[in-house]
Amino acid sequence: MYSLKDLCIQVAQKHVHDIDDIGDCPFELVKPILEKARPEHLIDLEEKSPHLKVDTQPLWKDHVLRDFGLELQKRTILNNIDDWRGLYGKLKKKRNAHYNVASAKLRSAYTKLEQSKQNKRIVPLEREPRAARPPKRPRPMSNYCPKSSLMARAKSDFLKKASATRHIVSATSSSRSFPQLHPLGRSSSNATNTSTKRPLTSNTYPSIPLPPKSFTSQNFKSFNAVKTQPSSSSSPSISRPTSFPMSFFPNPSRFSSQVPKRI
């Protein structure tokens, strides 16, 4: 069965972080409570109760072995240490210095990493840069005839020749004349005389003279009347118009050599 002292010590151990000062209590009474205190809290209690510093060396030894066991493995002699409180402070400062150096290195490395990320970050552009555009396909004649004054001169010469050829063709087509047909009922003698008077040229088609003034539309009417006259029962034969000699019509063999051949 626990005594009142033991019950009070157990409650004080659970709430050791709330104890600020122990006053003049002897070390043997508060030792179980101080064993549960953290090193920083123990330093505060020792400053407020200086009589505890003489008896708290075993407590500091336990803190050193628990917090800096790896650092003390390099030390071969630990029995000659008298001030465990001072050793704990030195090791704590050394560890803090290492932590500060490591944190500075980590901070600088993180800053460099952020800068590299910013440099490699994809930024949308309104217009594609010229270096990233695909190369233009060269024109078929660009490799053989680069753009220069020679090309411009050749182009101008070609346009001049094309315009001159166009004018020649238009003049030839406008000067070409078509043959005139002889009206029916024209005598062969008049046609022969007319052909001799107006010789044919080498570049134009032969022209047929106009009918004389004496030849009027009455001749066509008489010819049509004779042609369309109905046959009577008394006369068995059908009246026909007078025949025209072949010399009246132009001889096609004369014009074959003068008419331009089709290509």
Curated annotation (Swiss-Prot):
Domain of life (superkingdom): Eukaryota
InterPro entries registered for this protein in UniProt: Elongin-A_domain (IPR051870), RNA_pol_II_trans_fac_SIII_A (IPR010684)
Bias (Polar residues): 186-206, 214-229, 253-263
GO CC, one annotated term: elongin complex
Low complexity bias locations: 230-245
GO MF: transcription elongation factor activity
Assembly with partners or alone: Heterodimer with elc1. Component of a CRL3 E3 ubiquitin ligase complex consisting of a cullin, the linker protein elc1, the substrate receptor pof4/ela1, and the RING protein rbx1. Interacts with skp1.
Family: Belongs to the ELA1 family.
Official protein name in the record: Elongin-A
Organism, as annotated: Schizosaccharomyces pombe (strain 972 / ATCC 24843) (Fission yeast)
